[in-house]
Amino acid sequence: MKIAVMGYGTIGSGVVEVLEINKEKIAKRAGEPIEVKYVLDLREFPGTPIENKIVHDYKVIAEDPEIGIVVETMGGVEPAFTFVKAMLEAGKQVATSNKNLVAAKGAELIKVARDHGVNFQFEASVGGGIPIIRPLNKCLTADEIEEITGILNGTTNYMLTKMTEEGADFDEVLKDAQDKGYAEKDPTADIEGHDPCRKIAILTSLVAGQQVDFEDIHCEGITKITPEDIKYAKAMHRAIKLLASSRKVGDSYTCLVAPYMIDDTHPLSGVNGVFNGVFLRGNVLGDAMFYGSGAGKLPTASAVVADVVDMTKHQNT
C-alpha cells in the first residue's frame, strides 16, 4: 500500500517514524507493506530520508492512482478540509488526527467518503493514543451509550496535578507546562477548555448519530482555579479535574466542559499528569474506562497508523 502524508509537523513526522520503527510488524498486521510515497509540506527537508518524497501541490497526491490512503496531520480547518475532500472524491481513504477538522466538518466528510465508497477515520483526533473512536464505532454498537465523561486534555490535567501535588498557583504551573512543551505559547485552547470541547463534540456526534456543534456546548476552563480551591477539594477527599461530559437526556445528549470536584473513588480521579481517561456508561455494558497517553508525537502517531493499518487490511471489503 502506497500512502501520502499531508503535513510534516510533530504528528506527521511521527507517523513516518512509527511506520519505519515497526515496519515488519505493521506489514504483517496490514497484510502488505505500507510505503510513504509522498509528504505534502510547504518546506523542503534536504538531507533527510523524505527529501525526495516532498511535494507542494495536493493535486499530485489526488491524481496519483497508486496512492490508496492519505494521512492528514496539517491541523486547522482550512486548507485541510479542501485537501481531504479532494482526496475522498478521488477515491482515497483518509486518516486524520485533526480534531478541529473533525469537529467542524466531520459529518460532511463522512458523507463524502460514503458517497465515494471510501473511509474517513479519525481515531487520533480525540484521545491521542487512547483507542476510543473504534470501540464506539465497532465494539459498542449494541449499547445505548448513556454517558461519556473524560479528561481529554493532557495540558490542563498536568497543570491541575501539579497544583494538587505541589500547592503551586495557576500562573506558575502554566509557565512550567510551557517550558516542558506541554502547553503552546498561546495556551488559550487548552486552559479555556476549547480543546476538550471539540473532542466531546466529536464523541457525542458518534453516539448521537448526528453532528453536534462544539460552539453550542457550554465551556469553562481552569483559569479561575486557585490553590485554595485545591486545598478545599483535598480536605474533602476530592480531586479537581477538567471534565468534558455528555449525558443522554430523553432522546438527546447534553454536553458540558467545566472543572469538577470528583470523589477520590471515581475512576477518573486517579488520572494524573499528561494522561487522559474516558469513562463510558452503557445500558448493556455498564461502566468502562479507557486510559492512556492522551497527547504527544508517538502516541498520537500510533493511533493514526492504526487507522492506516485497519484501512489497508480491509481495503477490498
Where are the model-predicted features located?
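Short glycine-rich anion-binding loops that position phosphate/pyrophosphate groups of nucleotides
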Residues: 75-77, 153, 262
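Substrate-binding/catalytic subdomain of NAD(P)-dependent oxidoreductase enzymes
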Residues: 173-277
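Conserved active-site and cofactor/substrate-binding residues in soluble primary-metabolism enzymes
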Residues: 6, 10, 14, 34, ...
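Rossmann-fold NAD(P)-binding glycine/threonine-rich loop
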Residues: 80-86, 90, 97-137
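ATP-dependent carboxylate/acyl-activation modules
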Residues: 1, 5, 267-317
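N-terminal glycine-/serine-/threonine-rich beta1-alpha1-beta2 phosphate-ribose binding loop
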Residues: 1-90
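Rossmann-like NAD(P)H-binding beta-loop-alpha module
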Residues: 67, 114-183, 188-195, 202
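General beta-strand structural signal in soluble alpha/beta enzymes
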Residues: 54-55, 72, 95-97, 120-124, ...
